[in-house]
C-alpha cells in the first residue's frame, strides 16, 4: 500500500477596492486655513447592495502666532486646530457575506464526518446585509513652541464613535455553526493626547532633548442587542470593549489548598 496520496486544492476570489475622492484647501494670509475632503468607496467584501459608502471630513486651523497682538510674545509658534470627519473599515474576510460549504472529512484524512462517511458541513452562515463599519471622529488641538523653540509640544482632545461594529453574533448550535458575522453595536472613545519636548542641551556637536508623551482614553460599548453580553470577553452596554467577566477569586483554602471563589 502506498501511504502517500497527492492532494490538490484550489481557491479563487475576486478582490478589489474602488475609490473616488476630492479635496479642497483654502488659506488666507497664512493665518486661517480650511480643508474639505469627500470620498466614495466600494469594496468587494460586501454584497452589491451595501458595496458603496460615502465618507467626508472637514478641518480648520488658526495660526495665532501670525496675529499682530502676538508680536514680542514668548511663543515662536502657536496654532489652534480642529477637525471632524468619517472613515470606513472593511476588515471582514472576503467570504463572510455568503455561505461556504466545506468538506468535514475525506478518505485520506481523519475527519469529523458521521461514522467515517463523506460529509458536507456548513463552515459559516451567510449574511448579505453586512456593510461598512463607520468611524466618526472629532478632534480639537493646539500646537506650540516657545523660548526660541526650546520647549514645544501639542495637546489634543478627541471623541470617536464607531458604529456598525464587525462582531460575531452567537448562534444556536442547531444552525450548524456557532456564530454569524454581523454589524452589531457601537464603540465610543474619548480621550486626551499630549507630547512635550524640551531641549536640555543645544550645541554645534551635541543636542540633548527630553520628550514626554501621554494619553488618557475611556471607551464603552453601546447598542448591543442584549444587556447580558454578546461575545467572548462579555462585551456589555456601558462597559469597555475588552472587559472580562470572571468569577471573583477569594484565595486558597488553607485546609486543603484548593482555590476559592466568591
Where are these regions (language model features)?
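Short, intrinsically disordered, charge-balanced linker/junction segments flanking boundaries
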Residues: 1, 256-262
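Extracellular/periplasmic, surface-exposed regions of secreted and cell-surface proteins
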Residues: 1-253
Amino acid at each position: 500500500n502506498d501511504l502517500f496520496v497527492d492532494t490538490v486544492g484550489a481557491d479563487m476570489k475576486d478582490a478589489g477596492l474602488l475609490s473616488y475622492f476630492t479635496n479642497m484647501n483654502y488659506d488666507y494670509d497664512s493665518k486661517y486655513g480650511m480643508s474639505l475632503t469627500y470620498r466614495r468607496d466600494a469594496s468587494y467584501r460586501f454584497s452589491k447592495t451595501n458595496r458603496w459608502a460615502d465618507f467626508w471630513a472637514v478641518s480648520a486651523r488658526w495660526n495665532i502666532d501670525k496675529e499682530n497682538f502676538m508680536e514680542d510674545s514668548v511663543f515662536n509658534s502657536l496654532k489652534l486646530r480642529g477637525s471632524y470627519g468619517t472613515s470606513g473599515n472593511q476588515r471582514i474576510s472576503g467570504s463572510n457575506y455568503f455561505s461556504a460549504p466545506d468538506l468535514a472529512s475525506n478518505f485520506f484524512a481523519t475527519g469529523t464526518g458521521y461514522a467515517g462517511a463523506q460529509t458536507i458541513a456548513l463552515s459559516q452562515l451567510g449574511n448579505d446585509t453586512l456593510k461598512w463599519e463607520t468611524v466618526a471622529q472629532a478632534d480639537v488641538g493646539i500646537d506650540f513652541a516657545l523660548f526660541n523653540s526650546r520647549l514645544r509640544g501639542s495637546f489634543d482632545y478627541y471623541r470617536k464613535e464607531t458604529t456598525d461594529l464587525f462582531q460575531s453574533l452567537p448562534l444556536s448550535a442547531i444552525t450548524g455553526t456557532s456564530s454569524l458575522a454581523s454589524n452589531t453595536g457601537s464603540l465610543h472613545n474619548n480621550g486626551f493626547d499630549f507630547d512635550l519636548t524640551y531641549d536640555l542641551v543645544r550645541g554645534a556637536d551635541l543636542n540633548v532633548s527630553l520628550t514626554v508623551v501621554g494619553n488618557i482614553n475611556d471607551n464603552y460599548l453601546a447598542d448591543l442587542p442584549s444587556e447580558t453580553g454578546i461575545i467572548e470577553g462579555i462585551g456589555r452596554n456601558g462597559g469597555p470593549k475588552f472587559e472580562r467577566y470572571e468569577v471573583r477569586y477569594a484565595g486558597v483554602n488553607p485546609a486543603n489548598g484548593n482555590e476559592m471563589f466568591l
